[in-house]
Amino acid sequence: MSSPHVPTALTIAGSDSGGGAGIQADLRTFAAFGVHGTSAITALTAQNTRGVDAIHTAPTAFLRAQIEAVLGDFRVGAAKLGMLATPAIAQAVAGVLATRPQLPVVLDPVLVATTGARLGTQALVAGLRRRLLPLATLVTPNIPEAEALLGHRIASRDAMPGAARALRDAGARAVLLKGGHLRGSEVSDLLLTADGEHWFHQRRRRGEFHGTGCSLSAAVAAGLALGRPLEDAVEAAIHFVQQAIVAGYRPGKGALLVLDHLAAAP
């Protein structure tokens, strides 16, 4: 029996044992958008709402096997890249994706956990910049991640356009620079494409939320898998994350809150 095409997205990211971020958040996001979710796990993390205790990375050959198994069977409409953990993993992912240049790729350069734990080295930063930025349809760094990729501080909202242009110059086709780490009662995110700048402003929410970056990049990938233009996918993703934050809850004993993805389903 044949069935109609189901929009499908792929997340290539780490597993969060606490369920708040990583592939767990990505797959819930895909489901909220009505997109079939597939995954390739780059690393297993032992973490919870208090912090990251340990990381076990996947062998690169097995990671490639996961990605190729998905791409060889499903009509994947977009891929989202999250925690890549090591330069070897970044290189392996880049090697597979370079053979599929038509596949939209959303790169979330996960380098620091919400708790402050570092998830990447300088060698990984260099690998992301050299190998994966040129493959990215969209890169979605927060301020610390953009600073790591560029090697300089981004001290204010006024500095965001220059930083976004530098990331585009490094190879990304579009940049969504998230300004949540800057001070102020309002959070400003900047989308820079070949057509120019588009700003998004939201009221800052109180609390330390876990998995916002993962969910945002996954939501953009879901929108692209549904065939939406990039700007529309980004706008819908930002709205989705804001609604999921409003419905967020604290499932553990730590301070981190997690997003309620299903409550925010479009």
Predicted segment positions?
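Acidic-glycine-rich active-site phosphate/pyrophosphate-binding loop
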Residues: 1-6, 22, 185-199
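Conserved N-terminal subdomain of the carbohydrate kinase-like
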Residues: 2-11, 27-114, 265
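Charged C-terminal helix
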Residues: 6, 54-57, 231-266
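Short pre-catalytic strand/loop immediately N-terminal to key active-site residues, enriched for Gly-Thr
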Residues: 12-18, 197-210
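Short, small-residue alpha-helix embedded
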Residues: 29, 147-148, 207-230
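Phosphate-handling active-site elements
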Residues: 33-38, 198, 223-238
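Nucleotide and nucleotide-moiety/phosphate-recognizing core
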Residues: 72, 77, 87-104, 173, ...
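Conserved phosphate/ATP/ADP-binding segment of small-molecule kinases
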Residues: 122-196
